[in-house]
Amino acid sequence: MINPIAIKLGPLAIRWYSICIVTGLILAVYLTIREAPKKNIKSDDVLDFILIAFPLAIVGARLYYVIFDWDYYLKNPSEIPVIWHGGIAIYGGLLTGALVLFIFSYYRMIKPIDFLDVATPGVMLAQSIGRWGNFVNQEAYGKAVTQLNYLPDFIRKQMYIDGHYRTPTFLYESLWNLLGFIIIMILRRRPNLLKEGEVAFFYLIWYGSGRFVIEGMRTDSLMFASLRVSQWLSVLLVVVGVILIVIRRRNHAIPYYQC
C-alpha cells in the first residue's frame, strides 16, 4: 500500500492527494493563461479568478459530499473539515466554480462563454490528474474482481482493498478525461469546426457520458433513488450539452471559435 503522506516535515504532512490536486491546478492555470489572449482575457483576470474560485470550489466539493452523506456527518461533525482524508465530490466543485465564474465574469465584463471555452481543457486535464489522489487514498474504486493482471503491479497492489481486488474506476475516469482533453485540444485548433461555447459544451457531453458509465461500476459513491447521485447529474450534463449545441448550431449569428 502506498503511504498517502508524500513528504513529512516535522508536524507538516504533505499528502499525495494534495499534490495531485495542486499539480492539476497549476497545469490548468497554465493552459488557460496561454489561451486567454485569443479571447481578450488578461492573465491577471485568470489568476484573480483562480484565487477566488479554487478555495470556494474546494468548500463546495466538500459540502456536496457532506450533504449526500449527512447521516454519517451528523454523528461525526468533527469530520466535516477533514478534507485531507478524501471525501470531496468533483460535481460540487464544478458547480461552485461555474457559479463563481459567472459572477466574476459579470464584474470583469468578460463573456462567460469565452472564459468557459479557454478554461475547459485545463479543467479536463486537472480532473485526470486529480483522480490519482483517489488512487493513493484507495477511494473512488469499483466492485470486487478476481484479478487485475492487465494492470501494472503498483496499481494492482493499491487496488487490493478489504481482502479483494477492486475495479480501478479512478483509472478509467482519469484516462477518459485525458482522452477528452486530447480530443478537445485537437478540435479547438481546427478552423470553422467548433462554434463559440462548444468547447465547454463538448465537455458537458464527454464528461457526463463517461462519468455515468464509470459511476455505475463504483461501490463507494453516494446513492439517490435508483441511481447514484453523480449519475443523475451526469444525465443532466449530457442533456444540457446536447441542447446547447443544437441551439447554437441553428443560430448562424454565433461565430466559430477562433484558433
Swiss-Prot record:
Binding site for a 1,2-diacyl-sn-glycero-3-phospho-(1'-sn-glycerol): R131
Localization annotation: Cell membrane
A GO molecular-function annotation: phosphatidylglycerol-prolipoprotein diacylglyceryl transferase activity
Gene Ontology annotations for the cellular component aspect, listed alphabetically: plasma membrane
Keywords: Cell membrane, Membrane, Transferase, Transmembrane, Transmembrane helix
Entry superkingdom: Bacteria
Major site of localization recorded for this protein: membrane
Known role: Catalyzes the transfer of the diacylglyceryl group from phosphatidylglycerol to the sulfhydryl group of the N-terminal cysteine of a prolipoprotein, the first step in the formation of mature lipoproteins.
NCBIfam families: lgt (TIGR00544)
Family: Belongs to the Lgt family.
Protein name: Phosphatidylglycerol--prolipoprotein diacylglyceryl transferase
Protein species of origin: Streptococcus mutans serotype c (strain ATCC 700610 / UA159)
